Amino acid sequence: MYKHILVAVDLSEESPILLKKAVGIAKRHDAKLSIIHVDVNFSDLYTGLIDVNMSSMQDRISTETQKALLDLAESVDYPISEKLSGSGDLGQVLSDAIEQYDVDLLVTGHHQDFWSKLMSSTRQVMNTIKIDMLVVPLRDE
């Protein structure tokens, strides 16, 4: 029996699919439900000179992410306990959230396209996370 379900979303058009699937599970188990989005920290990826104010860009992205998470949470008929946003290594951020919020099921999506076969973030997460995972296949049309 699950007590707290965490849905990892990328805030794409597939995010509601994942959340609705998790809502069904949460209702059956009377579990808490939370969502998380992990942003890539752009300043960590580029080491050369750039001609933009990185902190103002990250602030804008963070504000947009929070609004998107709120909109997503309001799109379902189930209370969302936590709306989390993090940046950095996907596996580490998810591990930290799982530990901090006592999560026992992680729901994530997996694109079934050429690039995902080569570089899957889901595979990295599966090797990091120590709780049950539901990996929902997302087909690219």
Curated annotation (Swiss-Prot):
Pfam families, sorted: Usp (PF00582)
Main location (coarse class): cytoplasm
Domain of life: Bacteria
GO cellular component, one term: cytoplasm
GO-annotated biological processes: response to stress
Cytoplasm recorded as keyword: yes
CDD domains named among the record's database cross-references: USP-A-like
Keywords: Cytoplasm
Signal peptide bounds: none
Gene3D superfamilies in UniProt: HUPs (3.40.50.620)
Compartments it resides in: Cytoplasm
Known partners and oligomeric status: Homodimer.
Function recorded in the entry: Required for resistance to DNA-damaging agents.
General remark: Unlike MJ0577, UspA shows no evidence of ATP binding activity.
Entry's family note: Belongs to the universal stress protein A family.
Protein name per the record: Universal stress protein A homolog
Organism: Haemophilus influenzae (strain ATCC 51907 / DSM 11121 / KW20 / Rd)
Gene: uspA
